[in-house]
């Protein structure tokens, strides 16, 4: 396993996920009767700060349609949590206009690079071009002074 499991943290993530699903109107329990669904959801709601109770509730009352979705959500959350700890793995987002993103995407495919690598490459190229222009300007000035 790439990422360490944190039992208490993951129980809290599961609680958040299930309560959000419940508030969106989805049945998170294995029961068909509406009053029983509400009672079990309320029981889960009250067990927020008790990881053992959350895990027990999931084992006993979770809808058969949810375990895979729940596991996927927790796995993704765990990955984001651990990647967010280190600066070099932490993901950042930027807003791009669609046309800009499209051009960048095409250029990335052409260069066989990721978007991040392409942006880094373009910045490096621009910096080296600026450095070259400064050197050329300095040489021109030196030549003019020499020819006077």
Curated annotation (Swiss-Prot):
Any one GO cellular component localisation term in the record: cytoplasm
S-S pairs: none
UniProt-listed Pfam families: MatP, MatP_C
Subcellular localization: Cytoplasm
The keyword Glycoprotein is assigned to this record: no
Any GO molecular function: sequence-specific DNA binding
Superkingdom per UniProt: Bacteria
Gene3D superfamilies per the UniProt record, alphabetical: MatP, N-terminal domain (1.20.1270.380), Met repressor-like (1.10.1220.10)
GO biological process assignments: cell division; regulation of DNA-templated transcription
Keywords: Cell cycle, Cell division, Cytoplasm, DNA-binding
Protein role: Required for spatial organization of the terminus region of the chromosome (Ter macrodomain) during the cell cycle. Prevents early segregation of duplicated Ter macrodomains during cell division. Binds specifically to matS, which is a 13 bp signature motif repeated within the Ter macrodomain.
Family label: Belongs to the MatP family.
Assembly behavior: Homodimer.
Identification of the protein by name: Macrodomain Ter protein
């Amino acid at each position: 396993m790439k990422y360490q499991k944190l039992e208490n943290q993951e129980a809290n993530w599961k609680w958040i996920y299930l309560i959000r699903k419940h508030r969106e109107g989805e049945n998170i329990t294995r029961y068909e009767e509406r009053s029983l669904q509400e009672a079990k959801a309320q029981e889960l709601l009250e067990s927020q700060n008790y990881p053992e109770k959350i895990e027990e509730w999931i084992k006993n009352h979770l809808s058969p349609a949810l375990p895979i979705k729940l596991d996927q959500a927790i796995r993704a959350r765990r990955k984001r949590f651990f990647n967010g700890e280190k600066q070099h793995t932490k993901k950042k987002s930027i807003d791009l206009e669609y046309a800009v993103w499209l051009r960048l995407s095409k250029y990335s495919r052409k260069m066989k690079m990721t978007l991040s690598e392409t942006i880094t490459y373009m910045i490096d190229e621009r910096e080296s071009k600026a450095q070259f222009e400064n050197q050329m300007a300095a040489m021109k000035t030196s030549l003019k002074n020499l020819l006077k």
